[in-house]
């Protein structure tokens, strides 16, 4: 029965692991729902600021803000949003692959890349590659605060303003649904133009803005960029929880399958042991 005892111990170990993965799945599900609510709440604010900026920029014929002006690109900046924790499947790896493909494209054009990193997984990955990292933020937790993110964002904004980079992008995982998270790389600076359909020109926008358009655009553009990166962080967090939920469910299901297989092996071992004992009893009786 030594073999059967070892199998029982292994079954107990797998059951304990299954309890842990099931608990992690349930926690990830709860966190994902809360993050989805936060994500939905912040999106209208960001979209409205974007529309106001576009209308002010269109109405201010005599002033062209540097954040809205295209340049010849010699150096680009990327804000890459990754996770602080693992156990979320291939979420980070898929994002890293997408960014590395972009970096290769820029390198082929003799354009250098500088990074601002959010999330410890991204920090360790890109630093190991020896890439130029301007700023980094880690340990944002499950309730990221704008104040923690602003530093990395402003670092890139100032680099663009001072001509140290000629374009800024943000890379993150967009939450599509529970089963799908898509790596996305979006341009932040110079600010892409909105289509007339997105501007919603049916409404009345004949407003007099105070202070003057230049001061207002300066303030709104910085706030908009901070909001966009915050939105990316929240989106990535929802993707992380969804990916972790799926990964832990798969681990729980696999543990259940392994337990069934081990139980079958245990039953066979026990059956063989009982059969041997019966054979010994019968042989002993025959000898008498």
Curated annotation (Swiss-Prot):
Main localization of the protein described in the UniProt heading: membrane
Gene Ontology MF terms: ATP binding; proton-transporting ATP synthase activity, rotational mechanism
Superkingdom of origin organism: Bacteria
Compartments, as annotated in UniProt: Cell inner membrane
InterPro entries: ATP_synth_F1_ATPase_gsu, ATP_synth_F1_gsu, ATP_synth_F1_gsu_CS
Membrane disposition: Peripheral membrane protein
Gene Ontology process terms (BP): proton motive force-driven plasma membrane ATP synthesis
Keywords associated with the record: ATP synthesis, Cell inner membrane, Cell membrane, CF(1), Hydrogen ion transport, Ion transport, Membrane, Transport
SUPFAM superfamilies noted in UniProt: ATP synthase (F1-ATPase), gamma subunit
GO cellular component: plasma membrane; proton-transporting ATP synthase complex
HAMAP family reported in the protein's UniProt record: ATP_synth_gamma_bact (MF_00815)
Subunit structure, interactors included: F-type ATPases have 2 components, CF(1) - the catalytic core - and CF(0) - the membrane proton channel. CF(1) has five subunits: alpha(3), beta(3), gamma(1), delta(1), epsilon(1). CF(0) has three main subunits: a, b and c.
Function: Produces ATP from ADP in the presence of a proton gradient across the membrane. The gamma chain is believed to be important in regulating ATPase activity and the flow of protons through the CF(0) complex.
Family indicated by similarity: Belongs to the ATPase gamma chain family.
Protein name: ATP synthase gamma chain
Higher taxonomy: Bacteria, Pseudomonadati, Pseudomonadota, Gammaproteobacteria, Pasteurellales
């Amino acid at each position: 029965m030594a073999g059967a005892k070892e199998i029982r111990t292994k079954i107990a170990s797998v059951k304990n692991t299954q309890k842990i993965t099931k608990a992690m799945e349930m926690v990830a599900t709860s966190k994902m729902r809360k993050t989805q609510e936060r994500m939905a709440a912040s999106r209208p604010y960001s979209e409205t600021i974007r529309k106001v900026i576009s209308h002010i920029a269109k109405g201010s014929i005599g002033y062209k803000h540097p954040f809205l002006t295209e340049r010849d690109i010699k150096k680009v900046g990327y804000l890459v949003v990754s996770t602080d924790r693992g156990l979320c499947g291939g979420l980070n790896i898929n994002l890293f692959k997408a960014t590395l493909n972009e970096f290769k494209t820029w390198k082929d054009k003799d354009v250098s890349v500088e990074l601002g990193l959010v999330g410890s997984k991204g920090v360790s990955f890109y630093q190991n590659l020896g890439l130029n990292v301007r700023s980094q933020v880690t340990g944002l937790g499950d309730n990221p605060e704008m104040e923690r993110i602003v530093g990395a964002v402003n670092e890139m904004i100032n680099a663009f303003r001072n001509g140290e980079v000629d374009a800024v992008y943000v890379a993150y995982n967009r939450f599509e649904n529970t089963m799908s998270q898509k790596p996305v790389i979006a341009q932040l600076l110079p600010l892409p133009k909105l289509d007339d359909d997105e501007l919603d020109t049916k409404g009345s926008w004949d407003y007099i803005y105070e202070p003057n358009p230049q001061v207002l655009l300066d303030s709104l553009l910085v706030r908009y960029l901070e909001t966009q990166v915050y939105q990316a962080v929240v989106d990535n967090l929802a993707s992380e929880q969804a990916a972790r939920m799926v990964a832990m469910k798969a681990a729980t299901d696999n543990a259940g399958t392994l337990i069934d297989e081990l139980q079958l092996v245990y039953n066979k071992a026990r059956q063989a042991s009982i059969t041997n004992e019966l054979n010994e009893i019968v042989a002993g009786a025959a000898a008498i």
